């Protein structure tokens, strides 16, 4: 079984990443990955794309056909156009329902898997020490706080370890974000910086 230290750290890391990137962004990424897998749903999307190309081709041809000069051809294209449009709308509604179900399942799974760990483990293992502080290194009030709420005195409780993981991960993500913004700004500034014109050489 993985260590409780690692489980708590990974859980808080996942929660912080979701909060930083956004649940919608993560759902979109996982949805695109899911559609690349050989599933019936990905096959439906491929069929929809082919039908959409066919619809656009018929629509283009319909616009280029005169209803007065070529009525028979225009009427045939019109029926084909309406049939394809109806099929596309039905398929779109079906695929949107599948996407909604996917998002709901993903959100529920993510919430249950993270929140259950965040709430259940600290409650269940509240008396278990995560690790022990070096004896005599810290004053009484530090040891009391580290063992809050019910871990043995002189140890670090699972609640305090969870708080520490959350704080450290949040700081790391904030620092990484600031570094990326700084690098991007430097690159943008370098691109915008005008190239100085070379001075003409003086005649000797």
UniProtKB/Swiss-Prot annotation:
The UniProt record lists the keyword Oxidoreductase: no
Purpose of the protein: Required for the post-translational delivery of tail-anchored (TA) proteins to the endoplasmic reticulum. Acts as a membrane receptor for soluble GET3, which recognizes and selectively binds the transmembrane domain of TA proteins in the cytosol.
GO molecular function, one term: protein-membrane adaptor activity
HAMAP family: Get1 (MF_03113)
Annotated Gene3D superfamilies: Helix hairpin bin
Full protein name: Protein GET1
Lumenal compartment segments: 1-4, 132-155
Main location group: endoplasmic reticulum
Superkingdom field: Eukaryota
Cell compartment(s), UniProt: Endoplasmic reticulum membrane
Coiled coil: 72-107
Quaternary state and interactors: Interacts with GET3.
Topology in the lipid bilayer: Multi-pass membrane protein
One GO CC term on file: endoplasmic reticulum membrane
Cytoplasmic side, ranges: 25-110, 173-204
Family listed: Belongs to the WRB/GET1 family.
PANTHER family named among the record's database cross-references: GUIDED ENTRY OF TAIL-ANCHORED PROTEINS FACTOR 1, TAIL-ANCHORED PROTEIN INSERTION RECEPTOR WRB
Keyword Transport tagged: yes
Membrane-spanning segments: 5-24, 111-131, 156-172
Keywords assigned: Coiled coil, Endoplasmic reticulum, Membrane, Transmembrane, Transmembrane helix, Transport
Gene Ontology BP annotations: tail-anchored membrane protein insertion into ER membrane
